[in-house]
Amino acid sequence: METPTLNKSGSLTIVGTGIESIGQMTLQTLSYIEAADKVFYCVIDPATEAFILTKNKDCVDLYQYYDNGKSRMDTYTQMSEVMLREVRKGLDVVGVFYGHPGVFVNPSLRALAIAKSEGFKARMLPGVSAEDCLYADLCIDPSNPGCLTYEASDFLIRERPTNIYSHFILFQVGCVGIADFNFTGFENSKFGILVDRLEKEYGAEHPVVHYIAAMLPHEDPVTDQWTIGQLREPEFYKRVGGVSTFYIPPKERKEINVDIIRELKFLPEGKVPDTRTQIYPPNQWEPEVPTVPAYGSNEHAAIAQLDTHTPPEQYQPLATSKAMTDVMTKLALDPKALAEYKADHRAFAQSVPDLTANERTALEIGDSWAFRCAMKEMPISLLDNAKQSMEEASEQGFPWIIVVGVVGVVGSVVSSA
């Protein structure tokens, strides 16, 4: 299949507003809303809607395409198509969705795929998702001990596997098996089928956290801890709604592989690894997790070093001009300035007043390492090491920037790509 060329006028940028009203909207998202020719939005609180309307004069509410009993897939098709019609007219369109615009959102992904296939510029900007809020509010780390995330109906239909050693997050638990829409909410009559599966995997006594992220600044999140068995009782399941999420903590902790620990040389020779104990802090939602104390011998030793601490030789303090700070901020928050810079690095760099020579060179090069060297006070030893590794990469044909080993000075030697 021939790849379309990106030479058409018109573009589509998909952004997210986060979950909590207004405050979780990123600066990047706001800048694209303000710069758009036309904005389409689908948000769940009126304060965010009103805020969007103050940032652009041409806004359309996508929520109007929902209706009682109407297939959500039909709605999603219509939402994506009304955005695409304006892109095809040559407009720079922004689609705004609550949360992260690509997490449990269909019309955004559909519109992006079609726009790209037709040769238009199209991209998605990240936003704060309900899962991000859950991590923060429940104070859990998805990397420890890993995390599974499913949509509740899909979890049942496709018999998705669980992992009792990891965090488990289930979305859309308040509309199990429901494919249409209702302005008044969902009856959720198939909820018991989900409970059956959870009991089979974890047992009736295992904890489950009923979670709802705060949507308004003055609200607190819902973090009710129940047991899976309690989900069968009306007192509990009637509190599960369309924005409810379940978090199920690990049932057990998997022991480490001692042979792999030794092969990776994680511990000094002769030291026996602890196969069960977890680092501090423990997961407050998980039963019976053996955890080291907050202040053990290692922690006390580390804290004792604070009073005599000095920055290490390879620490890189900031050393940049106001002009460079301003231009980097402009590139981050002004889509039109960013487009100018991407079109011609050198011309843009030459147009910016009051830069140092190294800052201007970094702008012309456009490489992250060049920016770092121009904006940080770089120790000679670090630059020498970087120069050696980059020269080796350049010899192998990689398009690296070569940095000369002088503190704060960037060489503009660029190998051919």
Swiss-Prot record:
Q: At what positions is N-methylglycine found?
A: G405, G408, G411
Q: Where is this region: Clasp domain?
A: 252-378
Which residues act catalytically here? Answer: R72, Y76, Y98
N-methylisoleucine sites (modified residues)? I401
Keyword annotations for this protein, in alphabetical order, are: Methylation, Methyltransferase, S-adenosyl-L-methionine, Transferase, Virulence
Which modifications occur after translation, per UniProt? LedMA automethylates at Ile-401, Val-403, Val-404, Gly-405, Val-406, Val-407, Gly-408, Val-410, Gly-411 and Val-413 before being processed by the prolyloligopeptidase ledP which likely forms a peptidyl ester upon removal of the follower propeptide, which then undergoes macrocyclization with the N-terminus of the modified core peptide. Peptide backbone alpha-N-methylations change the physicochemical properties of amide bonds to provide structural constraints and other favorable characteristics including biological membrane permeability to peptides.
> Pathway involvement?
Mycotoxin biosynthesis
Residue numbers carrying N-methylvaline: V403, V404, V406, V407, V410, V413
- TM region positions: none
Q: Give the Gene Ontology MF terms in alphabetical order.
A: methyltransferase activity
Give the E.C. number(s): 2.1.1.-
List, alphabetically, the InterPro entries matched. 4pyrrol_Mease, 4pyrrol_Methylase_sf, 4pyrrole_Mease_sub1
Biotechnology comment: Lentinulin A displays strong and selective activity against the plant-pathogenic nematode Meloidogyne incognita but shows no further phytotoxic, antibacterial, or antifungal activities.
Is the keyword S-adenosyl-L-methionine in the record?
A: yes
Q: Which intervals of the chain are annotated as region Methyltransferase domain? A: 1-251
Q: Where is this region: Precursor leader?
A: 379-399
Locate the residues binding S-adenosyl-L-methionine. Y98, H100, V103, A130, Q172, A213, S244, T245
Can you cite a GO biological process for this protein? methylation
The record's listing under NCBIfam families reads:
omphalotin_tail
- What domain notes does the record hold? Within the homodimer, the clasp domain wraps around the adjacent subunit to position the core peptide into the other subunit's active site for iterative intermolecular methylation.
Sum up the protein's function in the record's words: Fusion protein of the methyltransferase ledM and the lentinulin A core peptide; part of the gene cluster that mediates the biosynthesis of lentinulin A, a highly methylated cyclic dodecapeptide with nematodicidal activity. Lentinulin A derives from the C-terminus of the ledMA protein, and it is the ledMA protein that methylates its own C-terminus using S-adenosyl methionine (SAM). The C-terminus is subsequently cleaved off and macrocyclized by the prolyloligopeptidase ledP to give the final product.
Assembly mode: Homodimer.
**What is stated as this protein's family in its record?**
In the N-terminal section; belongs to the precorrin methyltransferase family.
Protein name (record): Methyltransferase/ribosomally synthesized cyclic peptide lentinulin A precursor ledMA
Q: Which organism is it from?
A: Lentinula edodes
